[in-house]
C-alpha cells in the first residue's frame, strides 16, 4: 500500500496552460502587465518549464529597458541558450 508521500508525488499539480499563455500574451502586449506579473510570479510558478523560461526572458528585457516584443524575445531566448 502506497504511503502518503508516494501518493503526493504521483499527484499532478493543478495548472492551466491557457492561463499561463494568457499571462505571457498580456506581458507582450502591455508593459504594465510585466510589472504586475513580476510582482507576483516567478519562473518556477509556471507548470510548463518553457513558459517559465519565456517569462524570465521577458522580465530580463524589461529590466534592461529594452522593448519586449517577439523579435527581442526571440533574440533573448537564443542568447540564453548559449
Say what each PLM segment does.
Residues 1-82:
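Noncatalytic partner-interaction/assembly domains of nucleic-acid and motor enzyme complexes
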